Amino acid sequence: MKRQALFLSIFGVTMVTMPAFAADGASGITGVRWGKNAFNFEPMPSGPQPLRNLIRRPDGTGNAGQLVGDYHNPILKPEAAAVVKQKGELAAAGKGFPNAQDQCRAVAPPFTFAMQLSFQMLPKNNGDIAILYGQGDNVRHIRMNGTHPANLVPLPMGDSVGRWEGDALVIDTVGVRTDAFTSVDRFGIPQSDAMHVIERYRLIDGVLAKAAQDKYEKAEGIVGGGARFSGVNPDTGLKGLQLELTMEDPKVFTGPLTVLVTYRRLMTEWQEQVCADNPVEHYKDEWIGLPKADLADF
């Protein structure tokens, strides 16, 4: 089945034939806007675990508005644990610490998946995939069946190659350019130039997707207990999307860390979001000055 798209130009009207997207199966991952309400990562049933918030509400749930990461987690090397501890002390004292998103930097993997960012995958004419994120018009370009260049130049969103493994989309990313605001998650785990990220996306039953999101939101909480995507489609008859994310960074982690991130379909239309750069950070009625570069990084 094909669908027709109508394009207007100064030369007249052009009809372009585009492939239709199936509701399920491999192609059901693309052409859909996905979103989630909780921050950070869902744990795997076993193995190394992502950091947990040490600040708990009276009911035992995590307070996503005050981020004190478990720096004793054995997945962290001592240097990384010290950074998380320092940032946690700032948060516990009521002070914020900046990250790539609130500083209008590229929200690159794996931090992309620790945020509430919506996204949509769009197939390109040459078979590659573009991923649009709901933050500052961030875009990733996935070269399908490609390889990383031998002389890799670090890029704001890294270098990504992908492949289909049955009905799963697998994306391999290296070469993310780091700066003072780059981190793995919202607890401030540092990220080095050695970070290697493998994303494995697959469609899952809608009931399971809702259950996974509800369970994690209840356990770890969302900002203020209420900042949510109002456009999440409540129809559990629609497939959800589960990301199995593996992060390897020998300068930060003691071994590979694999986590889950569950997304559901959004009903709202794509909305452009413009990020305005700012030399200060506002956190709990306090303005915090931020470091400034002497020279441009381009």
Set out the residue ranges of the language-model regions:
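Bacterial N-terminal signal peptides that target proteins for export
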Residues: M1-L8
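Position-driven detector of the extreme protein N-terminus
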Residues: K2, V16-P19, P45
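Bacterial N-terminal signal peptides
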Residues: L8-T17
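PEST-like low-complexity, intrinsically disordered acidic/proline/serine-rich tracts
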Residues: A22-F298
